[in-house]
Amino acid sequence: MSLIKEFKAFASRGNVIDMAVGIIIGAAFGKIVSSFVADVIMPPIGIILGGVNFSDLSIVLQAAQGDAPSVVIAYGKFIQTVIDFTIIAFAIFMGLKAINTLKRKEEEAPKAPPAPTKEEELLSEIRDLLKAQQEK
């Protein structure tokens, strides 16, 4: 039973939950970027390069024989995946850069010392009066 309690304590910690949310959002963001690259970026690039569909670019190593499909190196899909990765990596870099900038600004702004309480003010006045009496 203690194993279950330990797991609940582990899973309910803020860092684990934040990580899970990050993974889910990251997966969704990856799908969005993949669609953006495949459906928005690559078609115009293909038109510019003479009507090339990048997802179809491949080198046939062995032609199809009977029921066996052909063996190919699909380098067009690889190019799309590299572009996906580059966009995702750049977005993560920009996000981390923004977070680091905000953290630096927080660190640079020194906190004002807290105002003295009434007790501290009274004690300071008493101290000053005692010093004045000793000097006489």
Curated annotation (Swiss-Prot):
Gene Ontology MF: a single term: mechanosensitive monoatomic ion channel activity
Subcellular localization, as worded in the UniProt entry: Cell inner membrane
Transmembrane parts of this sequence: 9-29, 79-99
Membrane topology (UniProt): Multi-pass membrane protein
Domain of life assignment: Bacteria
Gene Ontology, cellular component aspect: plasma membrane
Keywords noted in UniProt: Cell inner membrane, Cell membrane, Ion channel, Ion transport, Membrane, Transmembrane, Transmembrane helix, Transport
Family matches, as SUPFAM superfamilies: Gated mechanosensitive channel
UniProt xrefs under InterPro entries: Mechanosensitive_channel_CS, MS_channel, MSC/AndL, MscL_channel
Stored Pfam families: MscL
RNA-binding as UniProt keyword: no
Main location: membrane
Known role: Channel that opens in response to stretch forces in the membrane lipid bilayer. May participate in the regulation of osmotic pressure changes within the cell.
Subunit details: Homopentamer.
Family the entry assigns: Belongs to the MscL family.
Protein name: Large-conductance mechanosensitive channel
Source organism of the structure: Shewanella putrefaciens (strain CN-32 / ATCC BAA-453)
